[in-house]
Amino acid sequence: MRIDRLTSKLQLALSDAQSLAVGHDHPAIEPVHLLSALLEQQGGSIKPLLMQVGFDIAALRSGLNKELDALPKIQSPTGDVNLSQDLARLLNQADRLAQQKGDQFISSELVLLAAMDENTRLGKLLLGQGVSRKALENAVANLRGGEAVNDPNVEESRQALDKYTVDMTKRAEEGKLDPVIGRDDEIRRTIQVLQRRTKNNPVLIGEPGVGKTAIVEGLAQRIINGEVPDGLKDKRLLALDMGALIAGAKFRGEFEERLKAVLNELGKQEGRVILFIDELHTMVGAGKAEGAMDAGNMLKPALARGELHCVGATTLDEYRQYIEKDAALERRFQKVLVDEPSEEDTIAILRGLKERYEVHHGVSITDGAIIAAAKLSHRYITDRQLPDKAIDLIDEAASRIRMEIDSKPEELDRLDRRLIQLKIEREALKKEDDEATRKRLAKLEEDIVKLEREYADLEEIWKSEKAEVQGSAQIQQKIEQAKQEMEAARRKGDLESMARIQYQTIPDLERSLQMVDQHGKTENQLLRNKVTDEEIAEVVSKWTGIPVSKMLEGEREKLLRMEQELHRRVIGQDEAVVAVSNAVRRSRAGLADPNRPSGSFLFLGPTGVGKTELCKALAEFLFDTEEALVRIDMSEFMEKHSVARLIGAPPGYVGFEEGGYLTEAIRRKPYSVVLLDEVEKAHPDVFNILLQVLEDGRLTDSHGRTVDFRNTVVVMTSNLGSAQIQELAGDREAQRAAVMDAVNAHFRPEFINRIDEVVVFEPLAREQIAGIAEIQLGRLRKRLAERELSLELSQEALDKLIAVGFDPVYGARPLKRAIQRWIENPLAQLILAGKFAPGASISAKVEGDEIVFA
C-alpha cells in the first residue's frame, strides 16, 4: 500500500506512531501506537468523533497505555521499526472501506472504523466502551457530510466552524457575556434585516466605544432567552476569528481554503447559523496576493444569495475607507447606524453592569460613582465615546480600590519601615559600652516595644477589615453564580430548580451579605472598599491632568471670589479682571452659549501693563497650573503660507502627519487658556481660521478631525493704539474711542464682532508699581528660601526700586530690570563669596546712592 494514499493528517499520525514505538523500545509499529497517536493529535478529528459517540476518553487512554505496556520490548534498539502485520492488515481494511465509499485517499476515521473489529485486541478494547460500530458509522457519515475524500488535506478543513469561530450563543448560555442594557431599537433593526429573504446582512456602524459588539452580544442573549421572532429561534450566533483564520496559513491558497471550508460548513447548516464579523473592514484585502481573491470577494456570492446570514461591525471611518470603495460588497450589507448613548442612557447601562464589576473587583460601587463616571467622562474626556469611557472609569477606579485592599496600607508600611530603622540603630549601639549609649539603647528598646505593639494592633485591624471585604466579595460571587443557574433552569423549563434558587438560595445569600454589610457599617480605619465619586474624579484627573479639586470643589464660592484671586497676581486693571471674571461665571452658570468658547477677549494696551500676566493668572485660577496656558506667538505667522502650521499641512505636503500647532495643543489639553500673543502681527488669513473658533467653538484640522474649543478661554493680545493710550492718559472715554478706531482700521468687522469683549488696559500708575514690586520681591524671596536665606528690604530701598523702575511708557518691565540690577546681581556676588551662609537673614537698606546688604 502506497503511503501517498493516506491523508496528510493520517501520515502525520503514522509518523507520531513510529516515534511512540521507538520511545517504548517496541520492535514494530502496532495498531495501538497508531490509535494513541490519532487520539493525541492536535486539531485531529478522531478525539471529537469519539467524544461525540460517547467514549470515555480518559478510560480509553488508560486502556491504550496498558496495551502499550503489554507489548514486548527489545534489549538493544537500533531505532529502525517497521509496520507490524496487524497494522498492515488494519490499513488494508481501511483501504477497502475507502474504495467502497469512492475515496481517493484513506482518512483517519476509516482507520478507526476498521479498528472496531471484534477479533482484534484493539477492537475488543474499543467495543468494551459500550459503543456499537453502527453508532460510530453514523457519526462518521455525519462528519463526512456525504462527500468523498478527494483531497489529502480534507481533514484539516473539517470542523472549520469549531476551529475558526467562537460560539457567542454558547457564551451567553454560560453567562460569560455582560448584560446589554437599552439599545432595543438597534437590536430590533438588526433582527429586522436578518429576517429579510436576500441581502439579510446588517452592518453596525458607529464610532469606537459606542457598543457595536455589545449589540451583537445582546442579540445572542435574546436568542438564548427565546426573545426573538420564530425565524431566529434556536439559531447559533458565531463570531468569526480572523486571527485563527490567518495564523499559520504559510502557503498561497491556504487562507482561501480555510475560509472556503468555513463557508461550506455554513452552507451545510442551512441558515441555522448567523456569522458575526467584528472589524468587517479586515475582510477587504485579507489574503490578497497577486492574482488571488481576497476574503471580501469570496463572501460576495453567499451574501447576495442570502445563504450566509452575516452581521458586520465597523467604524464610520473604516467603512468609508474600505467597504464603500467596493460598491458590490457595500450593496450586500444593510447599514445600521449606532449613535453614542446620552448621559442618562449611559447611567442606565452602568447600573446594569455594576454587579459584574463589583463581583470581579470585590468592592462596592456607589450610585454617586456611576453618575460621576457618566457626567465627568462626558465633560472632560472629549476624544472618546460613551459608554466605553464611562465603563473604563468605573473599572479603573474599582481596580485601584482593589489594589489598595490587596497591598499593605500606607500607615502599616510606614510603621514597618520605622521599626526596621530603629532595629538597625539598636544593633549599631550594642557595640558601644559607655553610659550615654546604654541610656540611648534603653530608650530605643522602649520605642521599639511601643511601635511593635502599635503595629500589631493595626495589623489585626487590617486583617479583620480585609477578611470582611473578601467575605462580602465571595458572597456576591455566589449570588451571581446562583442567578446564572436560575437562568439556565428557566431555559430548560426546570421549574423546581428555578423556584429553589429564586426563593431559597438567593434570599439566603442576600441575608448573609446584609449581615456582613451591617457588621462592616462602621467606617473602616485602613481599607476603603467603596468606589465613590471622589475615586472616579481621581481617575479622570490622572487621565486628563485636570486637578480633582476643580471637579468636586464647590465652584460657586471660588467663582464669586474670582476677582480677588486674580488681583493677587495682576495689580490694577480692574476693568479687564471684571470682564474676564464675568465671562467665566457666565460659562460656569450655564448661561453662555454652549457652542462657543468659555470666553474670547482682545486685550489692548501698552507693553508691560499685565496683559500676558492676566492670562497666566487665569490659567492658574481655572486649572491650578500655568501649564494649562497654550501660548502662541502670532509674530511667527506673518507669511500667508504659515497659516497651515496652525491646523496642519494639507495632504501631500511635508509635515502632514505632524498635525497642527494649535489643533494638536488643544486636542491634548482641551481645558486650557489659549493666548494668541501680538495678534496684530499675524497674516490677515489667520483671522479666517479664528472666525470658526470664536463662532462655533470648533476647528477642523488637516486630517479632518474636529477639535473642540468649547472648554477653552481664547485671549488675544495686541499693542494697537498704545500710542493713543499714552497721549490721552486720564481720559478713559477718549482713550477707548481712539483705540477702537485703530482696531477697526486693522481688523475686519466680522472678526471684531465675534469677540466677547475688547478690553483696554490702562498705563500703570506709580502706586500700582509698588504692588508689583511686592509680587516680584515675593518671587525672589521664594527662590532664596530654597537656599535657606531670607530677605528684608527697608522702605527706603523699596522706594528707590520704585523710583528707578517706574516708566509709564514701558510699564512694569523696567521694575524687573531694576530688581535684577540693584538686588539680584549684588546678592549673587555676596552669596558666591560666602558672606551669607544657609540660615542667614539678609536685610537691604540704602546708603548714599547704593543699596547695601547686611
From Swiss-Prot:
* Residues in the signal sequence: none
Q: Which stretches make up the Clp R domain?
A: 3-146
Q: From which domain of life does this come?
A: Bacteria
Any single GO molecular-function term of the entry would be: ATP binding
* Residue span of region C-terminal: 764-854
Pfam families for the chain:
AAA, AAA_2, AAA_lid_9, Clp_N, ClpB_D2-small
Q: Where in the cell is it found?
A: Cytoplasm
- Annotated ATP 2 binding lies at 605-612
Segments carrying the region annotation (Repeat 2) are 83-146
Alphabetized SUPFAM superfamilies for the sequence: Double Clp-N motif, P-loop containing nucleoside triphosphate hydrolases
Please list where the region (Repeat 1) is annotated: 6-71
- SMART domains from the entry? AAA, ClpB_D2-small
Record-level GO BP terms: cellular response to heat; protein refolding
What is said about its interaction partners and assembly? Homohexamer. The oligomerization is ATP-dependent.
- Let me see what the UniProt entry remarks about domains: The Clp repeat (R) domain probably functions as a substrate-discriminating domain, recruiting aggregated proteins to the ClpB hexamer and/or stabilizing bound proteins. The NBD2 domain is responsible for oligomerization, whereas the NBD1 domain stabilizes the hexamer probably in an ATP-dependent manner. The movement of the coiled-coil domain is essential for ClpB ability to rescue proteins from an aggregated state, probably by pulling apart large aggregated proteins, which are bound between the coiled-coils motifs of adjacent ClpB subunits in the functional hexamer.
Membership in a protein family: Belongs to the ClpA/ClpB family.
| Name the UniProt record assigns to this protein | Chaperone protein ClpB
Source species: Pseudomonas aeruginosa (strain ATCC 15692 / DSM 22644 / CIP 104116 / JCM 14847 / LMG 12228 / 1C / PRS 101 / PAO1)
